Amino acid sequence: MNVVQGNIEAKNAKVAIVVSRFNSFLVESLLDGAIDTLKRFGQVADENITVVRVPGAVELPLAARRVAASGKFDGIIALGAVIRGGTPHFDFVAGECNKGLAQVALEFDLPVSFGVLTTDTIEQAIERSGTKAGNKGGEAALGLLEMVNVLQQLEQQLS
């Protein structure tokens, strides 16, 4: 039996982190968690990490697409925070962001890790950005590191 699974060390990986500025008091914690995870667990060097800042979650897919089209990166982490309000705006923003990022991954055959919080309350978002529910930015980085390795292994085995 042949099993393909990735580990999290990816010393030579070039990673772009596309970050929404909206709700920055939360998103900066996600960014810190992602960078810390890339460096500590993935052994990714500073010079191999590029941070791209965009206004909000809706802009994440376009920036991720441009990064992917450059061909210079092994993976992308998208970070943001969309918190439900009293209007349907949340559903549109969260849905389009998710759909757009998935499309980038499939179009460019590149791992795009979804680290965008989509919560009902600000308290839930705070819990997921580094307090009692962990740091979803760090979790997104772990997922990305593993997928970078899985895709590299698949490329070797299938070529």
UniProtKB/Swiss-Prot annotation:
UniProtKB keywords: Riboflavin biosynthesis, Transferase
User: Which InterPro entries has this protein been placed in?
Assistant: LS, LS/RS, LS/RS_sf
Q: Which GO terms describe its cellular component?
A: cytosol; riboflavin synthase complex
Q: Does the keyword Transferase apply?
A: yes
Pathway annotation: Cofactor biosynthesis; riboflavin biosynthesis; riboflavin from 2-hydroxy-3-oxobutyl phosphate and 5-amino-6-(D-ribitylamino)uracil: step 1/2
Catalytic activity as recorded in UniProt:
(2S)-2-hydroxy-3-oxobutyl phosphate + 5-amino-6-(D-ribitylamino)uracil = 6,7-dimethyl-8-(1-D-ribityl)lumazine + phosphate + 2 H2O + H(+)
Q: So where's the catalytic machinery, residue-wise?
A: H89
Which superkingdom? Bacteria
What Pfam families has UniProt attached to this entry?
Answer: DMRL_synthase
In Gene Ontology terms, what is a biological process of this protein?
Answer: riboflavin biosynthetic process
Q: Where does (2S)-2-hydroxy-3-oxobutyl phosphate bind?
A: G86, T87, R128
What is the enzyme's main class? Answer: transferase
The keyword Transferase is assigned to this record: yes
Annotated EC: 2.5.1.78
Q: What is its biological role?
A: Catalyzes the formation of 6,7-dimethyl-8-ribityllumazine by condensation of 5-amino-6-(D-ribitylamino)uracil with 3,4-dihydroxy-2-butanone 4-phosphate. This is the penultimate step in the biosynthesis of riboflavin.
Quaternary context: Forms an icosahedral capsid composed of 60 subunits, arranged as a dodecamer of pentamers.
Q: What family is it from?
A: Belongs to the DMRL synthase family.
This protein's name: 6,7-dimethyl-8-ribityllumazine synthase
Q: Which organism is it from?
A: Shewanella denitrificans (strain OS217 / ATCC BAA-1090 / DSM 15013)
Gene that produces this protein: ribH
